[in-house]
Amino acid sequence: MKEESILKKCDSSSIKHVPSTPLETNCPDKYNPKTWPIRLKVRNVIVISSMTFLNQYGDSVFAPSISNIAEQFHASRTLVTLGATLYTLGILFGNLIFAPLSEQFGRRPIYLIGYSVFALLQIPIALSVNLAMFLVFRFFSGLFGSVGLSNGSGSLADLFEKKDRGKYMVIYFTVLSIGPGIAPIISGFISQSSIGWQWEFWILLILSGFNLFWAFLLLKETYPPVLNRKKFEKYGEIGENEPVALRLTGKQLLIKLLILLSMKKPISILLSQPILICVACTIGSIYGMINLVLIAFSEVWKSSYDFSPGISGLMYISITLGLFSAVFIAMPINQKFYSYLVKRNGGEGEPEFRLPMGFIGITLFEIGILLFGWTARYKIFWFVPTIGSAIMGGGYIMTSNPLNMYVVDSYGIYSASASAGVKIFQLLFGAIFPLFAESLFRRLNYGWGCTLLAFILLACGCSLPILFKYGKQIRNLRPFDPSKY
């Protein structure tokens, strides 16, 4: 392809004679992703975003069919909901394993191997003969499908300078966020058809296989220390202060894997970095709540409004519209405000400049969940609770995107490992909250149940103004040193 030929042509001029100070050249350096042609970067972003989208699509893909699956396997709705919980726990463990492994072997092989297994695992899920088989393979599906989620933000940090990263981070995190909202729209009609809930997973297999084909063709390695290792092995020299990933022996790699599974590294990073604790609590709460609502959403329309499964699935469009509205209206405004703060700060960007939109996002999410809960409680005309769910979806994007970008900007090439600590909280909350959905709304009704959720989020979100005002001082109190982990 054109971009690859440019990289090959410039290889000798930009790499062969690498001094201690980076060489000035107009040619892109194939060992430095930040210098690649924009089209090559965008291709990587599209493939990685698609992987993450389908992983999140799989999270709620069977939500409209929970009752059907429960009936087939002679189980309760809560037990079947474990399929979502275990999937999310699989994503959690995948983040702990695949993010650091990419820092040893590179991003590309981790993406391709993990995603190949994810695609194949849809087969035994669709062919499950009992609930245990369904739940076990759902866990492993989440585990191997997490490669996009665990390494996506790190890949974007590899590809783009901080000043150019914002719009691509918005694309990535938006595609990530809309997956759970789109899946039930399709699955709702499948659940009421005669073809059976299994086709929800056959469709996921087809989509994953198609995306995997393009990943093998288009995805390039982007992790700088691994690229520097390749450069050093080929040319025998690299620039000063350029990080290099060391090759581990089989025994060293096994020890590292055991440490990863113990969660030592991400938990150590999380507990040693106050800003990560604040971000983790906020993102964890809002992610858990959106997962809870997604699981309960279809049942709200069936029980309160007597909608069919297909029409109930269509109601998820309101959440998706809220997500898209936030992307095309709110996030560009946030980027302009970020540029304004950078200009006011003498042209120097700070991670805290990403946060202002988060204040508005949390407020909107709370307004949306209260409006949805109380109007559904009193069975007010169906259009009104959809307004609440749309506001809720927009608030979710406007909160989670700035916070995720804040972590990426704060930790740079180590953002994959830093994000893993945050994702422990996020995914634990996302796994646990849906289990409470049925009992929460049965005991407190939709109005008071959503009010309780709003108060929990309010308590967690109080940290955002503190981070915006004092985040830099807090970061300087406990500087991040990757060698300690």
Curated annotation (Swiss-Prot):
Keywords: Membrane, Transmembrane, Transmembrane helix, Transport. The keyword Magnesium does not apply. It is a multi-pass membrane protein. The keyword RNA-binding does not apply. The chain crosses the membrane at residues 79-99, 117-137, 139-159, 170-190, 199-219, 275-295, 313-333, 355-375, 380-400, 421-441, 448-468. It holds the Pfam family MFS_1. GO terms for biological process: transmembrane transport. It is found in: Membrane. Gene3D superfamilies: MFS general substrate transporter like domains (1.20.1250.20). GO terms for cellular component: membrane. GO terms for molecular function: transmembrane transporter activity. Belongs to the major facilitator superfamily. CAR1 family. This is Uncharacterized transporter C1348.05. It comes from Schizosaccharomyces pombe (strain 972 / ATCC 24843).
